[in-house]
């Protein structure tokens, strides 16, 4: 198992495949961060990936996002790979000069993992996220930014 920087041009199709398999929705390529990591097995098969938004020239705040794993990966391999990925994203943020790292997820597995294995503190329990398409609809319904609960509520209204 090894780690490498992600390349949005060559890794994007894999991310889309995993997001589709997780029924997550597709994050537009142009909004993904330039910084990110991919964990691969010994045969260079991708296992998991995640991104890190940061602009150290303007602030020392990092935002870790889009952590996703191949849903077909064996659970033990996925667990070890995700640990390596998150530890590496935290190290990257530290090495680049970030002093605070923030992340948001609705995934209960990541909730536990962030606290137990990576030393993150839980911030909020019932926060809501909001997103606005500033292109007047180019990104459609933005399913990638909505939880199933929100999608169900929208369908009921």
Regions found by a protein language model. Give the residues of each.
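Short N-terminal secondary-structure initiator segments
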Residues: 1-19, 136-145
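Hydrophobic beta-strand residues in large extracellular and virion-surface proteins
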Residues: 3, 37-39, 101, 130
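Short secondary-structure junctions
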Residues: 3-4, 25-27, 119-125
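A conserved beta-strand-loop-helix scaffold within acyl/acetyltransferase catalytic domains
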Residues: 5-7, 13-42, 47-69
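Short loop segments at secondary-structure junctions
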Residues: 42-44, 72, 133-137
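Acyl-donor binding region in acyl/amide transferases
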Residues: 62-118, 124-125
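Active-site/acyl-donor-binding loops of N-acyltransferases
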Residues: 103-151
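Short acidic DE-rich linear segments
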Residues: 155-157
């Amino acid at each position: 198992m090894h780690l490498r920087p992600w390349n949005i041009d060559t890794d994007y199709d894999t991310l889309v495949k995993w997001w589709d398999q997780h029924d997550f929705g597709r994050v537009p390529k142009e909004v993904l961060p330039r910084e990110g990591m991919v964990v691969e097995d010994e045969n260079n098969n991708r296992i998991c990936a995640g991104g890190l938004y940061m602009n150290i020239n303007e602030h020392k705040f990092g935002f870790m996002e889009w952590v996703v794993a191949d849903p077909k990966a064996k659970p033990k391999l996925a667990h070890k790979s995700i640990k390596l990925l998150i530890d590496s994203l935290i190290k990257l943020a530290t090495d680049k000069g970030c002093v605070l790292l923030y992340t948001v997820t609705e995934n209960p597995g990541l909730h536990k993992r962030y606290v137990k294995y990576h030393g993150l503190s839980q911030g909020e329990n019932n926060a809501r996220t909001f997103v606005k398409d500033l292109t007047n609809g180019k990104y459609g319904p933005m399913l990638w930014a909505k939880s199933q609960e929100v999608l169900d509520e929208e369908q009921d209204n």
